[in-house]
């Protein structure tokens, strides 16, 4: 019975799931917006939000905890140098999930997951 067992299995064993969420978390931190399936996005939120909360207090212990969870030096550097200070005044809710239709091959629901308050990319607009 699965009473009180939280989290989604996503048809993967535990090591595959852990590796997948490490990769997705690193991608989200580096790109600040990624497109994935809706269940993965909802589960990724449970991984990334505590990492950003950890990054709000810059200490060696917190950096080591973040590295243990992501296994990526660049991700840890961006978390503590950029994202921690950016979200210092926000008390949670660092990510936003936007549904974006269904995948062509298998009709899986897709979604964008992004960090809120991310800097807008200046689009090349030509004024005539």
Curated annotation (Swiss-Prot):
Keywords: Ribonucleoprotein, Ribosomal protein. Signal peptide: none annotated. Gene3D superfamilies: Ribosomal protein L17. The keyword Repeat does not apply. One of its GO terms (biological process) is translation. Disulfide bonds: none annotated. Pfam families: Ribosomal_L17 (PF01196). GO terms for molecular function: structural constituent of ribosome. GO terms for cellular component: cytosolic large ribosomal subunit. NCBIfam families: L17. HAMAP family: Ribosomal_bL17. Part of the 50S ribosomal subunit. Contacts protein L32. Belongs to the bacterial ribosomal protein bL17 family. This is Large ribosomal subunit protein bL17. The gene is rplQ.
